[in-house]
Design a protein with these regions (language model features):
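Short beta-strand segments at enzyme active-site cores
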Residues: 7, 45-52, 137
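Active-site-adjacent betaalpha module
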Residues: 2-4, 31-42, 61-182
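Generic N-terminal amphipathic, Lys/Arg-enriched alpha-helix
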Residues: 5-20
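A short acidic, helix-capping loop that chelates divalent metal ions and anchors anionic groups
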Residues: 14-18, 56-59, 144-147
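Short, basic/glycine-rich phosphate-binding loops at helix/coil junctions
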Residues: 14-15, 50-55, 73-83
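A short alpha/beta connector and helix-capping loop motif
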Residues: 19-39, 44-48
Length: 182
């Protein structure tokens, strides 16, 4: 069984002073970096960095050719690692991610990145729908608080609601510490 790591949208706009600052992105990125390093040290060449580039300027962040859209320094890809550019929350939608995974015979994916409630959720569900055994490293993900009408949902609750919904049916959800013990 061949395994790939998918690193989603760990980009500058999600960090302090970015245009769409998340809660605790530094902690999530540091945990993602540990998982990336594990892949690199264990001769796992199947690392896919996904970068969201806004196709509509109205989005207000991840605008083309801006510092905010660049991959954060904590998780910079190496020259030989795969780069995927996306324009939608689902990392598979209108990208070559699936074809590249199939070319390499990948059957299992490990997912880390941002935002838990959008791009992580959409990508994990799509991966399972496409037949990949999927693991989500939950503490290598970050999100933000959400609101609906007069209700505000804190980021931690948003995060755990989404990872709880994904756990079992869609993914094996584990911590970076548990992953690194393997």
């Amino acid at each position: 069984m061949s395994t790939a790591l998918i690193v989603i949208d760990i980009q500058n706009d999600y960090f302090p002073n970015g245009k769409m600052e998340l809660v605790n992105p530094d902690k999530a990125a540091a945990n993602a970096a540990k998982v990336i390093e594990w892949f690199r040290q264990n001769n796992k060449d199947n690392i896919f960095h996904v970068q969201h580039i806004a196709s509509d300027p109205a989005l207000g962040f991840f605008l083309p050719d801006t510092e905010g859209s660049e991959i954060h320094e904590t998780v910079l890809p190496l020259e030989h690692e795969n780069m995927i550019t996306k324009h939608f929350p689902n990392s598979f939608l209108k990208t070559d991610l699936e074809s590249k995974l199939r070319e390499k015979g990948i059957t299992k994916v490990i997912v880390v990145g941002m935002m838990t409630h959008l791009c992580i959720d959409a990508t994990v569900r799509a991966a399972v729908d496409l037949g990949y055994e999927t693991t989500l490293i939950e503490d290598a993900c970050a999100t933000m608080e959400l609101s609906y009408q007069d209700k505000v949902v804190p980021a931690e609750q948003v995060h755990y609601a989404f990872v709880s919904a994904l756990n079992g049916m869609y993914a094996n959800v584990i911590s970076s510490g548990d992953f690194l013990k393997k």
